[in-house]
UniProtKB/Swiss-Prot annotation:
Its main location: periplasm. The gene is copA. Belongs to the multicopper oxidase family. CopA subfamily. Cu cation 2 binds at H102, H142, H572. This is Copper resistance protein A homolog. Gene3D superfamilies: Cupredoxins - blue copper proteins. Residues 367-403 are annotated as: 2 X 8 AA tandem repeats of D-H-X-X-M-X-G-M. SUPFAM superfamilies: Cupredoxins.
Length: 589
């Protein structure tokens, strides 16, 4: 049985922390506190987890959160590759709950998705998860029920490898990045449905217009503003939910709490970064230190030395750093630059380094969205296909939605993009990318030409060859679609409640091509099976469980349907998933 670790009795809020100290509103997990060795947590093969309500204070305001074993995040679980683990999850909420083991390969009935894997865990009920651990690395776990993940039901997961890893380190720290809102998540959703840019406090001003006229001229500025107005979109709307309501947390602690990880000078330190947020992409750097990226989504990659990395929602990255004596700031700013999570690596308790300012606010361009050079004056905002002259009659978007192009990989250069018939005159689709590319070498909006070496997907190369080796027998193309004004999200313009399952035959190897027709980024996660990302020429690059899809991108990956059952396939932006960007993948004999 695992040993319970001691917990801090209180976490101070952003404001009025000195006044509130001693109230005992909640407990911070011991693994999230500074310690001289490996992080504490629950380890072994048998675990007891309880999901319930806990009073917390993160921002200076007392709120009721949903927690696992009383903490945010939940306990760090440590498994060992090759073991069989048993996890007894008890529900002390007044609603059904669940736990999904993100990125873990396991039987379908252990995956933890109500309605697909099982019925969920009823109030006062318990579910016993039991499965063999077939992998190693950095992962996480979270509720797959409603908005419970946003309310605090998540935690980190580390699986120790049974064989020596291809790098060394003397110490490790888990760094879990999340977003917290004092608001009820249902209220957040209600606001987004009424006004999709409700939380965008970075809208352009008259002053911005005057500055742009000075730089670009009157004609170019007014034309650009007119195009955005025609699309009923805003180039500053990079995140549906922003720092206007979110506080960004590092290991459950707000920026002013300064989570601290200790080290001895000259040690090699492994940092296990986990983005367990509901809606936030983070750009992570440690001023004064290079990071050697050694793993992505739990699996080893060929080492890449960078200054900064963007971590999509649900992704994980492992890096090695080697700090000298002193203090270093762990700085994770939100992609829209409305806030940051922050911590410190230090050789002595109490030390801290300067916190850098937020980078300038980035703006989306037409090129970002695959719309460069297009005439928006004739744009039909009922989403009439951008290429009306093409014959789409042969597209099959029913039992296997998507265009089937055999084994054709993505093209290296931008291509004129066709679209499925289901997007035609669709009230749930307000935009279509017209010229798409893989964008594997692109650091992403807000990170280009910033003077720092930024990790890109092109840098990610697994330390192993394609584990399957077969060419895909067919290609499934799916479009990520949405309507910004209505805050509606879908695949191919078809929301989950109206969509048929994607049917895969057990054992087949397929290529999935994703096209992002929206102005938002989408991290796409397939449960139960690995996603083997390809380069522009269809060659295997890296094995992942979550694929980041920037606006206007077209990316492909291979999937081996080696897991029977019903599996979730969805955008991991929680509010996008809840609003329809979700499919069932069914693997049958």
């Amino acid at each position: 049985m695992p040993t319970r670790t001691s917990r801090r009795t209180f976490v101070k809020g952003l404001a009025a922390s000195s006044i509130l100290s001693g109230l005992g509103l909640w407990r911070s997990p011991a693994w999230a506190l500074p310690n001289p060795g490996q992080p504490d947590g629950l380890s072994g093969t048998e675990f007891d987890l309880t999901i319930g309500e806990t009073q917390v204070n993160i921002t200076g305001n007392a709120r009721t959160a949903m927690t696992i074993n009383g903490g945010i995040p939940g306990p760090l679980l440590r498994w060992r590759e090759g073991d069989t683990v048993t996890l007894r999850v008890k529900n002390r909420l007044d609603e059904t709950t669940s736990i999904h083991w993100h990125g873990i390969i396991l039987p379908a009935n252990m995956d933890g998705v109500p309605g697909l894997s099982f019925d969920g865990i009823a109030p006062d009920g318990m579910y016993v998860y039991r499965f063999k651990v077939r992998q190693h690395g950095t992962y996480w776990y979270h509720s797959h029920s409603g908005f419970q993940e946003q309310s605090g039901v998540y935690g980190p997961l580390v699986i120790d490898a049974k064989e020596p890893e291809p790098f060394t380190y003397e110490r490790e720290h888990v760094v879990m990045l999340t977003d917290w809102a004092d608001e009820d998540p249902a209220r957040v959703m209600k606001k987004l449905k009424k006004q999709s840019d409700y939380y965008n406090n970075n809208k352009r001003t008259v002053g911005d217009f005057i500055n742009d006229v000075g730089e670009k001229g009157w004609s170019a500025t007014t034309a650009e503003r007119w195009m955005w107005a025609q699309m009923k979109m805003n180039p500053t709307d990079l995140a549906d939910v922003s720092g206007a309501t979110y506080t960004y947390l590092m290991n459950g602690q707000a920026p002013n709490m300064n989570w601290t990880g200790l080290f001895k000078p000259g040690e090699q330190i492994r940092l296990r970064f986990i983005n367990g947020s509901s809606m936030t992409y983070f750009d992570v750097r440690i001023p004064g230190l290079k990071m050697t990226v050694v793993a992505s989504d739990g699996l080893h990659i060929k080492p890449v030395v960078v200054d900064e990395l963007r971590i999509a929602v649900a992704e994980t990255f492992d890096v090695i750093v080697e700090p000298a004596d002193g203090a270093y700031t762990l700085f994770a700013q939100s992609m829209d630059r409305t806030g940051f999570a922050r911590g410190t690596l230090t050789s002595r308790p109490g030390m801290q380094a300067e916190v850098p300012p937020l980078d300038p606010r980035p703006l989306l361009s037409m090129d970002d969205m695959g719309m460069a050079g297009m005439d928006h004056g004739s744009m039909n905002h009922s989403a009439k296909p951008a290429m009306d002259g093409m014959d789409h009659s042969k597209m099959d978007h029913d039992s296997m939605p998507g265009m089937d192009h055999g084994t054709m990989p993505m093209q290296e250069a931008p291509v004129m993009q066709s679209h499925p018939d289901s997007e035609r005159n669709n009230p749930l689709v307000d935009m279509q990318a017209m010229s798409t590319s893989a964008k594997l070498n692109d650091p992403g909006i807000g990170l280009r030409d910033n003077g720092r070496k930024v990790l890109t997907y092109a840098d990610l190369r697994s330390t192993f060859e394609d584990p399957d080796g077969r060419e895909p027998s067919r290609t499934i193309e799916l479009h990520l679609t949405g309507h910004m004004e209505k805050f509606a999200w879908s695949f191919d313009g078809v929301k989950f409640s109206d969509a048929k399952p994607l049917m895969l035959k057990y054992g087949e190897r397929v290529r999935i091509v994703l096209v992002n027709d929206t102005m938002m980024t989408h991290p796409i996660h397939l449960h139960g099976m690995w996603s083997d990302l390809e380069d522009e020429n269809g060659q295997f690059m890296v094995r992942k469980h979550t694929i980041d899809m920037p606006p206007g991108s077209r990316r492909s990956y291979r999937v081996t349907a080696d897991a029977l059952g019903r599996w979730a396939y969805h955008c991991h932006m929680l509010y996008h998933m809840e609003m329809g960007m979700f499919r069932e993948v069914r693997v049958e004999e």
